[in-house]
Every structure is written in structure tokens, then in C-alpha cells.
Amino acid sequence: MNISIPQIIAAILNFIILLLIVKHFWFDKITAVVDSRQSEIINKIEDTDKNQKLALELKEKNELELSNAKKQGKTIVEEYKSKAENVYEDIVKEAHEEADRIIKKSRLEAERQKKNAEEEIRAEAVELAVLVSSKTLEKTIDDLEHRRLIKDFISKVGI
């Protein structure tokens, strides 16, 4: 295959003419389509970047709200725990006070019963003393009999 210079020049001229025809009729349209597609791609990239930034902002906002909610929940739990402890302490304090009142009342009642018992013993002692005196007056007793009566009296009284 032989290639000659006039063929090369003819091919170059044909290519230039074809290029000029394409440029004149279709190059503006092709450039417009390419530019349109390029701007569309750029807009989509920008929208994607905006959406990604918005998503990150929303994520940070949600994480902050979640953190605040956890803190608030912890605060509420601690507050109710503190209130429950205060109620517990109040109940225990009231129980101790009630127990102290019951003990004091029981001691007072025991003291009252003790005094009543002492009064009864004194009354019995007086009665026994009167009885012993009347027996003594009824008969004359010697010193030994007198001591025996006193010992009986003391043993009955419980002194």
C-alpha cells in the first residue's frame, strides 16, 4: 500500500472541512449538552454535600438531645432516689419516735403499777400491824413471842 502526499493533503482537507461543518451545525448543541450535563453533575454533587452536612448537623443535634435526655433522666432518677431516701428516713425516724413513746408509756405504766403494788403492800402492812397489835393487846407475850411476831410480820410484808 502506497500513500502519497496528495492523498494525505486531501484527507487533512476533508477532515478540516468536516470539522468546520460539524462545528457550524452541531458543536454549539454538543457543547450545550455537555455543559448542561456538567452543571447537572455539579449541582448534584453540591446537593449531596449539602444533604451530607445537613445529615451531620441533624445527627449532632440528635446526639446532643439524646445526651441531654440521658442527663435529665439521670437527674430525675437521682431526685426521686433522694426523695425516697428522705421518706425512708422520715418513716424510720417516726418509727423510732413511736417506739420511744411506747417504751416511755410502758415504763410509766410499770411505774404506776409498781406504786399501786407498793400502796397495796403498805395497806396490807398496816392491816397486819393492826392485827399484830390487836393480838398483842389480847394477850401478854414474852420477848421471844414478840420477836417471832415481828419476823412473821416482816416475812409477810416482804421487807
Swiss-Prot record:
SUPFAM superfamilies in the record: F1F0 ATP synthase subunit B, membrane domain
CC annotations in GO: plasma membrane; proton-transporting ATP synthase complex
InterPro entries in UniProt: ATP_synth_B-like_membr_sf (IPR028987), ATP_synth_b/b'su_bac/chlpt (IPR002146), ATP_synth_F0_bsu_bac (IPR005864), ATP_synthase_B_chain (IPR050059)
Main localization, broad class: membrane
GO molecular-function term, one example from the UniProt record: proton-transporting ATPase activity, rotational mechanism
Signal sequence interval, chain numbering: none
Any Pfam family: ATP-synt_B
Annotated compartments: Cell membrane
Bilayer topology: Single-pass membrane protein
Transmembrane spans: 2-22
Keywords linked to the UniProt accession: ATP synthesis, Cell membrane, CF(0), Hydrogen ion transport, Ion transport, Membrane, Transmembrane, Transmembrane helix, Transport
Domain of life: Bacteria
Subunit and partners: F-type ATPases have 2 components, F(1) - the catalytic core - and F(0) - the membrane proton channel. F(1) has five subunits: alpha(3), beta(3), gamma(1), delta(1), epsilon(1). F(0) has three main subunits: a(1), b(2) and c(10-14). The alpha and beta chains form an alternating ring which encloses part of the gamma chain. F(1) is attached to F(0) by a central stalk formed by the gamma and epsilon chains, while a peripheral stalk is formed by the delta and b chains.
PANTHER family: ATP SYNTHASE SUBUNIT B, ATP SYNTHASE SUBUNIT B', CHLOROPLASTIC
Family according to the record: Belongs to the ATPase B chain family.
Main function: F(1)F(0) ATP synthase produces ATP from ADP in the presence of a proton or sodium gradient. F-type ATPases consist of two structural domains, F(1) containing the extramembraneous catalytic core and F(0) containing the membrane proton channel, linked together by a central stalk and a peripheral stalk. During catalysis, ATP synthesis in the catalytic domain of F(1) is coupled via a rotary mechanism of the central stalk subunits to proton translocation.
Protein name: ATP synthase subunit b
